């Protein structure tokens, strides 16, 4: 059998697996070094007791012949869909438009698969690598990278001479940690409706938004129901990174150019390819949603982020984002070349970061810091960063 040629279009290594390999190699060479990993956005705050209690009860039911149940509904437990509609969307989205999944990554893949090959995809530059990789794997015809720079306040420059099928937008953004305001999202929604495009809106970090003037969902914007699909996740907010649970919204108003509803095909795809998420996980999520918006984990990560921001600025770095998101986008002085920036932080500070260029060409000259670690690690990293100004450091000969 011939290989799927789409794989030949991918980078040899996924960004974060390459970072892990570099960290492991450094540890072998320097076993005495204490490395603080602020690169990958993994979580550190434990599950809430109410979530654990509900999960345990649900598992015990599966061990009792009287309460055992097998397959659950493919589209998600009705009680969880209703809870999400109430808490996150305040009735703007009906439970029937909410679909429970195992997380945003698989949602993104299924959405691209839903619309099929040959499409033109637009992504923010810099952006989460999964959008481009998934577009390549599913046979997209063209990928347009839209520059998001400090000069544009990290808002994508919308092309006027390109027909876009799927517009990938992440807000709060990974990697820049910045958030699009209502006016910016309205501009994107108006463009999509005028052009017949679909916005794939990644709201995985919406729980970090504390400013009431900022939208937490694309469906806060008038007109979005006819042009957008939203994905979200409990990985960061409830600590479900290893438990796995997310959801997506496909509005009934969203139609193909022939007038057929997209939601019909979406349900058909799920019925064929998916048997639903683990029932105890879904039931524990119902308890978790009741905790919103006052989440201890989010407060923990916000505190970490404030410590990092203060330390980085004290060390004379220019810092963007991190106030409404768990990521800080840090501009690196010109005397540190992009090809050396990961090794610079690893050797000089014993801190692992994510090089900005891994998120796209507009990420050159930047690195991403994650505030999702343990506070004691964040404090130690801040102490190392503030020992000297970055302008007093020298690039090591690596």
Curated annotation (Swiss-Prot):
Pfam families: Aminotran_1_2
Catalyzed reactions: (2S,6S)-2,6-diaminopimelate + 2-oxoglutarate = (S)-2,3,4,5-tetrahydrodipicolinate + L-glutamate + H2O + H(+)
Keyword Disulfide bond: no
UniProt cofactor(s): pyridoxal 5'-phosphate
Listed SUPFAM superfamilies: PLP-dependent transferases
Disulfide bonds: none
Signal peptide from the UniProt entry: none
Record keywords: Aminotransferase, Pyridoxal phosphate, Transferase
BP-aspect Gene Ontology terms: lysine biosynthetic process via diaminopimelate, diaminopimelate-aminotransferase pathway
Pathway(s) served: Amino-acid biosynthesis; L-lysine biosynthesis via DAP pathway; LL-2,6-diaminopimelate from (S)-tetrahydrodipicolinate (aminotransferase route): step 1/1
Residue sites binding substrate per the record: 14, 41, 105, 128, 174, 275, 368
Subunit structure: Homodimer.
General function of this protein: Involved in the synthesis of meso-diaminopimelate (m-DAP or DL-DAP), required for both lysine and peptidoglycan biosynthesis. Catalyzes the direct conversion of tetrahydrodipicolinate to LL-diaminopimelate.
Protein's recorded name: LL-diaminopimelate aminotransferase
Source species: Chlamydia abortus (strain DSM 27085 / S26/3) (Chlamydophila abortus)
Lineage: Bacteria, Pseudomonadati, Chlamydiota, Chlamydiia, Chlamydiales
Gene transcribed to yield this protein: dapL
